[in-house]
């Protein structure tokens, strides 16, 4: 039997050594009983208090598996792991080579305790969580103290109580109301898909077999996201015109519902197949030298770091030219269609994979959770439906090589990491993930191109266009796969991918400045104006983190709007 808890730490901001100065934990089922929450003023006292609570629960109920969630285990977990290593406390943990923290586990004689990351299930802020689950409390302002205080103020206890209560409510919704069994949203979605798929008397591996390592690697050389495409013509200009913003309704679920997707073991060809079948899908390895046609949007992202460096771009950028270099590209038939339309290119076909397709693979799953989302009787049911709809496709492309981080303390007692040996993980079926994103990208770029004269910016699932009565878009406020009008701006400025500002019209007719910038804190965004939003501008207040003695220090540094070499 499993019993769930929620926890939180407040830590000092001393640049030499950090420590937990306030902690709180609570049983998830008691999320609304703040008088039962346990508060402590050191990490050691937190662990002692938690152990006593677990031991009492085990004695009373027989529950022998305890899981406590922290909302960002990478931060809070660094204090735990540092403490365990410093005190020779045996634990197991899983941190991958990308620095993503999943769990820390302690084994006791009668029960186990695992610290887990709630962000893997509820991937949004505590403040957002309070609104989603309609809680009568709101997240406050984090108290930042350089040193551990001698006296704990009541408002600080109130603050941490609220944080833990909101997190506990979110976990209660997922694990008690909606019966989650996994600890990442993607794993939960795949488990549920397999359950529904079995109902149709079909075997998962008959359609999604384990691919040969070379074939799987070929597919993964293609995988890129839907991407963000900024304007070519209006970059850096302040635009004083009406701008409309459109979002695709449930883009990835709609793509899975409305399109055939690959199945089975693909055929492999040298070069290009003599016959291209309309009901089959293809991944092409080509070598190409290319330049963007006049009046067309770029569609190519350079995935290989070496190739990207050769032509002076980042791997996330769309590019306009190969600069007379011959570049290796891995393109689906959807990507190739755009490439040939948008670029003047010299191409040599090196190798091709050909897939059979099936058109109803995900219909039962998507329609089930579409209905649940549209007819949800509770915030928990609606949130689970959204998670199920949006988390499945990516799991098909999950990494097959797992590299764990090994933690150790350096000679100053600071937590450090090194990579462990590689481990192979059984793949799901990468072609599904790559074709879902490829089809979605084809849809977005094609719609952007059809509205070329009005185009300003394409985000993962949205278009930003000059207001016009002649836009070519299939618009519906709710229908899957169609464009919903999400907002209107009276003024805007687009610098590059993930970096733009728009003065949006609110429901009451007033306007507010919406600032998008990866790495910008809310405090930095408040300083942004149309005048100072320029390449090269710097702003104080960017948050960064580093390991120091005791755990993770969050500190402020300078945010700079950087120029890039890329040509979009």
Curated annotation (Swiss-Prot):
GO terms for MF: DNA binding; DNA-directed DNA polymerase activity; exonuclease activity; nucleoside binding; nucleotide binding
EC number(s) per entry: 2.7.7.7, 3.1.11.-
Superkingdom in the source lineage: Viruses
Coiled-coil region(s): none
Catalytic activity annotation: DNA(n) + a 2'-deoxyribonucleoside 5'-triphosphate = DNA(n+1) + diphosphate
One annotated GO biological process: DNA replication
InterPro entries for this protein: DNA-dir_DNA_pol_B, DNA-dir_DNA_pol_B_CS, DNA-dir_DNA_pol_B_mt/vir, DNA-dir_DNA_polB_phi29_vir, DNA/RNA_pol_sf, DNA_pol_palm_dom_sf, RNaseH-like_sf, RNaseH_sf
Record key words, sorted: DNA replication, DNA-binding, DNA-directed DNA polymerase, Exonuclease, Hydrolase, Nuclease, Nucleotidyltransferase, Transferase, Viral DNA replication
Gene3D superfamilies named among the record's database cross-references: DNA polymerase, domain 5, DNA polymerase, domain 6, Helix hairpin bin, Palm domain of DNA polymerase, Ribonuclease H-like superfamily/Ribonuclease H, TPR 1 domain of DNA polymerase
Family statement: Belongs to the DNA polymerase type-B family.
Functional description taken from the UniProt entry: Replicates the viral genomic DNA. This polymerase possesses two enzymatic activities: DNA synthesis (polymerase) and an exonucleolytic activity that degrades single-stranded DNA in the 3'- to 5'-direction for proofreading purpose.
Note: This DNA polymerase requires a protein as a primer.
Protein's name in the database: DNA polymerase
């Amino acid at each position: 039997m499993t019993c769930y808890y929620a926890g939180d730490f407040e830590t000092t901001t001393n640049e030499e050594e950090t420590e937990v100065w306030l902690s709180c934990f609570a049983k998830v089922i008691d999320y609304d009983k703040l008088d039962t929450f346990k508060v402590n003023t050191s990490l050691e006292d937190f662990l002692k208090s938690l152990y006593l609570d677990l031991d009492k629960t085990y004695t009373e109920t027989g529950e022998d598996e305890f899981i406590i969630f922290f909302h960002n285990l990478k931060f809070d977990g660094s204090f735990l792991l540092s403490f365990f290593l410093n005190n020779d406390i045996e634990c197991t943990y899983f941190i991958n080579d990308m620095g993503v923290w999943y769990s820390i586990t302690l084994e006791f004689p009668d029960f186990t305790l695992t610290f887990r990351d709630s962000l893997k299930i509820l991937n949004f802020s505590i403040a957002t969580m309070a609104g989603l689950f309609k809680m009568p409390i709101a997240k406050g302002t984090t108290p930042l103290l350089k040193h551990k205080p001698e006296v704990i103020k009541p408002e600080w206890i109130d603050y941490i109580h609220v944080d833990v209560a909101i997190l506990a409510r979110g976990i209660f919704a997922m694990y008690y109301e909606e019966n989650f069994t996994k600890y990442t949203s993607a794993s939960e979605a795949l488990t549920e898909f397999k359950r529904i798929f079995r109902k149709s008397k079909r075997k998962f591996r008959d359609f999604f077999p384990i691919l040969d390592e070379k074939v799987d690697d070929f597919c993964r050389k293609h995988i890129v996201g839907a991407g963000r495409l900024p304007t070519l013509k209006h970059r850096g200009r302040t635009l004083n015109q009406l701008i409309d913003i459109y979002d695709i309704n449930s883009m990835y679920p709609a793509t899975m519902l409305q399109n055939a997707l690959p199945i089975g073991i693909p055929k492999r060809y040298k070069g290009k197949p003599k016959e291209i079948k309309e009901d089959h899908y293809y991944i092409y390895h080509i070598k190409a030298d290319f330049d963007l046609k006049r009046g067309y949007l770029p569609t190519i992202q350079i995935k290989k770091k070496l190739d990207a460096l050769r032509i002076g771009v980042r791997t996330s950028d769309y590019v306009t030219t190969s600069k007379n270099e011959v570049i290796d590209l891995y393109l689906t038939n959807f990507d190739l269609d755009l490439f040939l339309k948008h670029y003047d290119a010299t191409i040599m076909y090196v190798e091709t994979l050909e897939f059979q397709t099936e058109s109803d693979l995900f219909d039962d799953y998507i329609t089930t959770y579409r209905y649940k989302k549209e007819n949800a009787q509770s915030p928990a049911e609606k949130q689970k439906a959204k998670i199920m709809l949006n988390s499945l496709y990516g799991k098909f492309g999950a990494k097959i090589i797992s590299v764990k981080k090994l933690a150790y303390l350096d000679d100053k007692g600071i937590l450090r990491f090194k990579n462990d040996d590689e481990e192979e993980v059984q793949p799901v079926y990468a072609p599904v993930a790559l074709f879902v994103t490829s089809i979605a990208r084809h849809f977005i770029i094609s719609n952007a191109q059809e509205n070329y004269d009005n185009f300003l910016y394409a985000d993962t699932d949205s278009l930003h266009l000059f207001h016009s009565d002649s836009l070519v878009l299939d618009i519906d406020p709710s229908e899957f796969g169609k464009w919903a009008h999400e907002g209107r701006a009276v003024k805007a400025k687009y610098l590059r991918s993930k970096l733009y500002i728009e003065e949006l019209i609110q429901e009451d007719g007033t306007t507010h400045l919406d600032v998008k910038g990866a790495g910008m804190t809310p405090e930095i965004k408040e300083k942004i104006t149309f005048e100072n939003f320029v390449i090269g501008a710097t702003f104080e207040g960017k948050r960064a983190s580093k390991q120091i003695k005791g755990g993770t220090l969050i500190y402020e540094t300078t945010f700079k709007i950087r120029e890039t070499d890329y040509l979009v």
